[in-house]
């Protein structure tokens, strides 16, 4: 290399290192439902400016709120509203809530069950499956196969919302559950890998030809029904900060809820505000 080329390369790398060191880091953690959205938003946001760099990890809604309350994350991702006990535990500062999109919990079954004719379910039927009172698909006019019910782990916002809206309480026992999945992606893998499973997922995970999305209480889980509230298992997705956001955290939040960020949401299978 010529001396001039070498000097230019040194200057270039010095500039890159300087930019990297100067960028304020924003850590986002929590809900696995929100995770793919936040990752896509962060990738676009990070590529548009150099002052703030956002990193995203999962862990579940409860873990994200804990991380924010303990000062380990600037932003918590949540698929449910913060609870009174969480507010009380970290009462030194007030949590700030930011709506970032709509979502619906979709009831999904293995493709062979769907293809055999199980295409809808009622709240009562679903509750009885997870309570262990309905145990075979033939009881729902399906094939003679045991029902393999999948639930989310403790601390999951999706689990809490499902238990509250379907089972009647977030703390309810669900003896019909055969396995507990650590995250939305794991639920989808378990359902698609079985010929007799049922589970619940956020809307963005429930698309695809490798599983069957059930009509719930006579209502299809689509964008229109989720946004207008007619789909019974509709909800909002949130960002939370513990106290006032840092400048870069606020900048990222503003991007996500702004027109560019909402476009990213729609392009990645989420339901914009």
Where are these regions (language model features)?
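Exported/periplasmic ABC-transporter solute-binding proteins
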Residues: 22-273
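Bacterial N-terminal signal peptides that target proteins for export
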Residues: 1-8
């Amino acid at each position: 290399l010529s001396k001039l080329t070498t000097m230019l390369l040194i200057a270039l790398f010095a500039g890159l290192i300087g930019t990297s060191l100067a960028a304020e880091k924003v850590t986002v953690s929590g809900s696995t439902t929100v995770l793919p959205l936040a990752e896509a938003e962060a990738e676009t946001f990070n590529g548009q400016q150099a002052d703030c760099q956002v990193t995203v990890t999962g862990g579940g809604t409860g873990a994200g709120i804990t991380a924010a309350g303990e000062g380990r994350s600037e932003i918590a991702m949540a698929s449910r509203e913060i609870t009174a006990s969480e507010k009380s535990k970290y009462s030194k500062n007030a949590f700030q809530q930011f709506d970032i999109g709509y979502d619906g919990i979709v009831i999904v079954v293995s493709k062979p069950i769907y293809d055999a004719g199980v295409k809808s379910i009622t709240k009562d039927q679903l509750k009885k499956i997870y309570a262990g009172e309905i145990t075979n698909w033939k009881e729902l006019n399906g094939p003679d196969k045991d029902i393999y019910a999948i639930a989310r782990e403790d601390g999951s916002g999706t689990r809490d919302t499902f238990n509250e809206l379907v089972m009647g309480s977030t703390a309810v026992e669900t003896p019909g559950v055969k396995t507990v999945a650590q995250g939305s992606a794991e639920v989808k893998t378990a359902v698609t890998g079985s010929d007799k499973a049922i589970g619940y997922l956020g809307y963005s995970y429930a698309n695809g030809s490798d599983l069957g999305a059930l009509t719930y209480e006579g209502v299809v889980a689509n964008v229109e029904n989720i946004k207008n509230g007619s789909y019974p298992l509709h909800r909002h997705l949130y960002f939370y900060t513990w106290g006032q956001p840092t400048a870069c955290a606020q900048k990222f939040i503003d991007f996500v809820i702004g027109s560019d960020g909402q476009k990213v949401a729609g392009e990645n299978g989420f339901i914009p505000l």
